[in-house]
Amino acid sequence: YDIPVASLRARAVFTNTMSTQAYRSSGRPEVTYAIERLIEVAAEHIGMDALELRKKNLISSNSMPYRNAVGSVYDSGDYKTNMDRATKLADWDTFDTRKKDAYKRGKLLGRGFANYVESSIGSPKERAEITVNTNERLEVVIGTQPSGQGHETSFSQVVADILQVPVNKIDIRLGDTDVVSVGGGSHSGRSMRHAGTVMAMASIDLIMEAKRRAAKLLKCSVDKVDYTDGRFQSLASNLKLSLFDIHRKTQVSHGSLSAKRTNEMHDPVFPNGTAICEVEIDSDTFDLKITRYTTVDDVGRCINPMIVHGQTHGGIAQGVGQAILEDCAIDINSGQPIAGSFMDYGIPRATTLPFINAEIAEIHSPTNPLGIKAGGEGGTTPALATVVLAVLDALKKYDVKDISMPI
């Protein structure tokens, strides 16, 4: 939102019984929750529709890059389009009909809405090494370490696209400290942006080295070598050579065909989006059920939509868990956590969540060559706000103004 001024106050507390830790999108879900709650309160106070109040105060896409009140520069985004897409996807205009139907079944239907912006930067340095092997495979060494994000797939896609080779001929080597000389790790939504960028650079370097070798094989100048559809060809010859051909023909004289590239990026990017949640509360038992969840997430250029959707779904599950279930309870006498294992701890299950209606927006970031933002934390960032606001909306007839988490 176009908030002209901001005042920040921080308080540091030392404790050995923390109730939370740095978590997915750490800090941003809580800030988004506070802002979206305040918008709802303000809208009620001035007698204005909360959705219209949000639209009235959105940052325009024409204002990008936008410097906010605390000095952060939002690189790109179209927040109004996110809102419009999400409300259409969520069948916003037919909510009243669903609410009446729910009431007939003894249910209280509520709806929550949240826009979000989150930041992604992480360790600025990353290195990629690409080597053509004699078994006609490419080995890519990179310093990230996935924990289910599918790096092996999406990283291979980036390299395959630039080098114009089949994706199944690429081997991604991760997490081996005997091989990885430099690596920033996987955190803060940095992996695809930093690794993708440096792998793209290394791929271009590999093509240039291959062109230099191909020029000697084709007996022409480097500028006369064309690379199309995975083949090097002289403009004056019909002979075509693949990367693997060049490696095989020049390995003895020039060594392995390879490229190494190190890169640093210090500018953050700002993934953003909109989330809408609907909940049903049983009017007798007050049992809570999330019935609909809709989200539109601007991740910049999306390399693999299926993986991004998986990241979004997982992030939503974590945010829903924080909003309605999870509580790190501590025994006040011993200081020990009461939940000794996940058997004793309230986390969301598949049955906790409805079918998630998610769409991806792709406003490319100008901060890196591939236009990537991030897709790992966007699901979590608006979840607290949209779930809690939906619950408060459902309980409006009881004049409930606030409710603490976990619900």
Q: Whereabouts are the PLM-identified features?
A:
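Short beta->alpha junction loops/turns
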Residues: 28, 144-145
